[in-house]
Amino acid sequence: GLPVCGETCFGGTCNTPGCSCTDPICTRD
């Protein structure tokens, strides 16, 4: 299935593939 991009992040990168960091949470690219 599609990756779930729910981790928190602050100006960095996301551990989940296909996700980008939009402070303060990762969102799907």
Curated annotation (Swiss-Prot):
Positions of disulphide bridges: 5-19, 9-21, 14-26
Domain of life: Eukaryota
Post-translational modification: This is a cyclic peptide.
Entry-linked InterPro entries: Cyclotide (IPR005535), Cyclotide_moebius_CS (IPR012324), Cyclotide_sf (IPR036146)
Crosslinked positions (Cyclopeptide (Gly-Asp)): 1-29
UniProt keyword annotation of Cytoplasm present: no
Pfam families: Cyclotide
Key words, A-Z: Disulfide bond, Knottin, Plant defense
Domain-level remarks: The presence of a 'disulfide through disulfide knot' structurally defines this protein as a knottin.
Identification of the protein by name: Kalata-B11
Source organism of the structure: Oldenlandia affinis
